[in-house]
Regions:
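Alpha-helical linker/edge segments of TPR/alpha-solenoid repeat scaffolds
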Residues: 50, 67, 97-108, 135-143, ...
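Terminal, low-structured helical/coil segments at or just beyond the last alpha-helical repeat
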Residues: 9-11, 181-244
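Helical anchoring/docking segments at protein termini
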Residues: 1-51, 223-244
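N-terminal topogenic membrane-targeting module
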Residues: 25-28, 36-107, 111-114
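Alpha-helical adaptor scaffolds
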Residues: 82, 86-163
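Solenoid-like repeat scaffolds
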Residues: 42-47, 77-85, 113-120, 146-152, ...
Length: 244
């Protein structure tokens, strides 16, 4: 947010400074303030982008190499940048929460995921699933309601939300939720299939979402699919320890 405040202050100073110096009137002062803000924001964004992109690329390489602790530290080191770049902190906390969860640090994961941006659909879905498994259905549905409102075309989010509603015998609400999603994405096959299943009073299936679904821990995968715990996209799983 510092960036917005700084750009606004600079733009207003330049725009209305000209008015005070009698260079232009009120209308031009407002116009030039907007122009100065846009120019300042572009310059600022370019500067921070040149720092952020290499840092994120380094984190990706660390995760692909299975260097989980190092990747977590790199993400933590970027948190101060969240004071300057809007929404960045929430995205970083989302990545850190996913990383902590798939590293087996559940308590730390929940703490981080609570601070994740509502637009980080995968992180918010995971947090809701953890609460649901812990029996806190109210909190789970609060998280899902907001996440679904923000991520309106996230098929797995909507289907998982409906699955949990159906699980607690709120099938009518589950149908209404999927119907709402199908208005935006009428050709989504997994959603159409689950909608039909709900209408026929049969069990929903999430197999179409493959390991992304099973990694949430609400259902066990078929034995043919192997071990359930998987890292997020772009992550490598930590090596198995010998003797276990």
């Amino acid at each position: 947010m510092y960036s917005v405040i700084l750009c606004s202050a600079l733009a207003l100073s330049l725009g209305f400074g000209g008015f005070l110096l009698d260079w232009w009137g009120w209308g031009w002062a407002i116009f030039f303030s907007l122009i100065f803000f846009v120019v300042g924001w572009i310059l600022f964004a370019r500067r921070f982008s040149s720092r952020l992109q290499p840092a994120m690329a380094a984190v990706q390489r660390q995760m692909q190499a299975g260097q989980w602790d190092l990747a977590m530290q790199s993400l933590e080191d970027m948190l101060p940048m969240g004071k300057w770049i809007p929404l960045l902190r929430g995205q970083l906390l989302a990545q850190m929460g996913l990383l902590a969860y798939h590293s087996g640090k559940k308590d730390k994961a929940m703490e981080l995921l609570e601070g994740a941006s509502a637009r980080a659909a995968d992180a918010r879905l995971l947090l809701a699933c953890i609460h649901f498994k812990n029996g806190d259905h109210k909190r789970a549905f609060e998280i899902l309601q907001l996440a679904a409102a923000v991520n309106r075309k996230h098929a797995m989010l909507y289907n998982a939300y409906a699955w949990m509603l159906h699980k607690v015998e709120r099938s009518d609400e589950a149908q209404a939720l999927l119907a709402k999603f199908l208005k935006r994405d009428p050709n989504n096959a997994p959603t159409k299939d689950n909608m039909l299943r709900l209408q026929n009073r049969t069990r929903m299936t999430m197999q179409a979402f493959d390991m992304q679904w099973y990694a949430l821990g609400l259902e066990q995968p078929p034995q043919s699919m192997g071990q359930v715990r998987r890292a997020p996209k772009g992550f490598r799983e930590p090596p198995k320890q010998r003797g276990r």
